[in-house]
UniProtKB/Swiss-Prot annotation:
Skin-specific. Expression was readily detected in adult trunk skin, adult arm skin, fetal skin, penal skin, vulva, esophagus and tongue. Not expressed in the cervix, rectum, lung, colon, or placenta. The lineage of its organism: Eukaryota, Metazoa, Chordata, Craniata, Vertebrata. The gene is LCE1B. Belongs to the LCE cluster present on 1q21. Belongs to the LCE family. One of its GO terms (biological process) is keratinization. Residues 87-118 are annotated as: Disordered. Pfam families: LCE (PF14672). Residues 104-118 have a biased composition (Gly residues). The keyword Transferase does not apply. It comes from Homo sapiens. Residues 90-103 have a biased composition (Low complexity). This is Late cornified envelope protein 1B.
Amino acid sequence: MSCQQNQQQCQPPPKCIPKCPPKCLTPRCPPKCPPKCPPVSSCCSVSSGGCCGSSSGGSCGSSSGGCCSSGGGGCCLSHHRRRRSHCHRPQSSGCCSQPSGGSSCCGGGSGQHSGGCC
């Protein structure tokens, strides 16, 4: 009898049943992340479209003033008389002269109202 009692004492205790995890407070579908801001060094100002000039290039023709031209730094400057916006290279007179778009104005140097990246 003593051996049987010892064997019962040596048996491991029954495993505890885990409790149900608390319900998540967050919704099932998390909110969509906003698009990542591109680096400042490769962007144009918002007044000229606010698009970035990536090395892969871009496209032109959105209703908000367009995107950057290929090569980086070039903004699409929308004209009031024409319906479509036209892309300009950074070397042209109607766009940024630098890829950063921060130090130089375009369109004759008259500032943002000329459609440049200042």
